[in-house]
Amino acid sequence: MTLWINGDWITGQGERRRKTNPVSAEILWQGNDANAAQVAEACQAARAAFPRWARQPFAARQAIVEKFAALLEAHKAELTEVIARETGKPRWEAATEVTAMINKIAISIKAYHARTGAQKSELVDGAATLRHRPHGVLAVFGPYNFPGHLPNGHIVPALLAGNTLIFKPSELTPWTGETVIKLWERAGLPAGVLNLVQGGRETGQALSSLDDLDGLLFTGSASTGYQLHRQLSGQPEKILALEMGGNNPLIIEDAANIDAAVHLTLQSAFITAGQRCTCARRLLVKQGAQGDAFLARLVDVAGRLQPGRWDDDPQPFIGGLISAQAAQHVMEAWRQREALGGRTLLAPRKVKEGTSLLTPGIIELTGVADVPDEEVFGPLLNVWRYAHFDEAIRLANNTRFGLSCGLVSTDRAQFEQLLLEARAGIVNWNKPLTGAASTAPFGGVGASGNHRPSAWYAADYCAWPMASLESPELTLPATLSPGLDFSRREAV
């Protein structure tokens, strides 16, 4: 029984699915997808639970969310292992994901009050008050790269605001989704407030097609995000949050400290085996001897990265990709770029056929035409050389995406110029592209998403503002508008 609907664990009536470890092929989870009728049942349960949940005092909702945080802390080792085994990422990195989930609770409580709390201004004859109200029933679509942390970034703010939810994890990480929901169950959520439906494309389409849905919070690929945007067009009554991918540029203008610049680049491009939406995909390196030395050192150090199993000792920097198919897609993207005229600096290599273990690849594409503007979700870094900083900014902005951008330089003026001209929601200076603060907004422009549906601004998508002019009693104004006569006439 792998679906949780209206407080009950039930068996899916859809396609049979099993999840294996992407490196060892060990079977980790088996279950059936939710069919369309079960998705509708989950929505009905959420709708029925909404009025009572929304009317709960905020403190009551907060108490349940904080109980969930305590359960995360108590079961940190267990959840870390589930995430690591299911995604293929090393244990150390999975542990940081669970820590981020725990930290998200206090941050979301602060964000609720800062972004969507109540404000009151006294007027001469009353008060003007701003309040926020939950949307109602929201769907949450989770990704596979951070199957605990990223859905958590929508679920927690949405529950705090008083919404009820239907959560569909990625079909590639059902085990993590189920494990997290069991902790929510133990935290004491009332029946129907949070519902779990497992499944792939058909389940997702059934969920996004529901008429009785007040909104959808999505994290995933641009192609799926665009599909959802088209599907919900003409329905302004539904809130849609899209957190999508990026084709992110990292500009190496001044690499005087070569090893520090190489370390920053490795952290930007290859952490999580390149499976972060903020990962550097395009490396822009200034022409000249310093840039040559930087690239040579980058290829040298990156070539020593050996992906390993989640529980290897010592731990590897990167583990496997989410699937062998994902690793194959990266290999095909590299070969495509070679066929276009790219010059391979470091060839990616499958460590073992049939697994998702893949070494990093680096390919130079300076002067190559018709390079696809796409997010290759894995450890493949594309290099361009440039002559001057204005050209670097032009290259950086030459994409339909706009998530993250970074600069390695000692010149503050160059960073200020980049801040003004970059088309990106995150612009870092001498910091990895993959570094982001949960106390700041997270998201991008263009094909990277709409507004900032994650991190500090996630609360904005979970409640709508209600403005009120109010007074405890009704009185006649001392001064009337022109043309109004309230004088009492003598009876004749």
Swiss-Prot record:
* InterPro entries reported for this sequence: Ald_DH/histidinol_DH (IPR016161), Ald_DH_C (IPR016163), Ald_DH_CS_CYS (IPR016160), Ald_DH_CS_GLU (IPR029510), Ald_DH_N (IPR016162), Aldehyde_DH_dom (IPR015590), SuccinylGlu_semiald_DH_AstD (IPR017649)
Record's note on what induces expression: By nitrogen and carbon starvation, and arginine, via the ArgR and Crp transcriptional regulators.
Keyword Repeat included in the entry's annotation: no
Which reaction(s) does the protein catalyse, per the Swiss-Prot or TrEMBL entry? Answer: N-succinyl-L-glutamate 5-semialdehyde + NAD(+) + H2O = N-succinyl-L-glutamate + NADH + 2 H(+)
Q: Which domain of life is it from?
A: Bacteria
GO biological process terms, alphabetically, are: arginine catabolic process to glutamate; arginine catabolic process to succinate
Q: Which residues bind NAD(+) per the record?
A: 220-225
Family, as annotated: Belongs to the aldehyde dehydrogenase family. AstD subfamily.
PANTHER family reported for this sequence: ALDEHYDE DEHYDROGENASE-RELATED
Q: What is this protein called?
A: N-succinylglutamate 5-semialdehyde dehydrogenase
Taxonomy of origin reads: Bacteria, Pseudomonadati, Pseudomonadota, Gammaproteobacteria, Enterobacterales
The encoding gene is astD
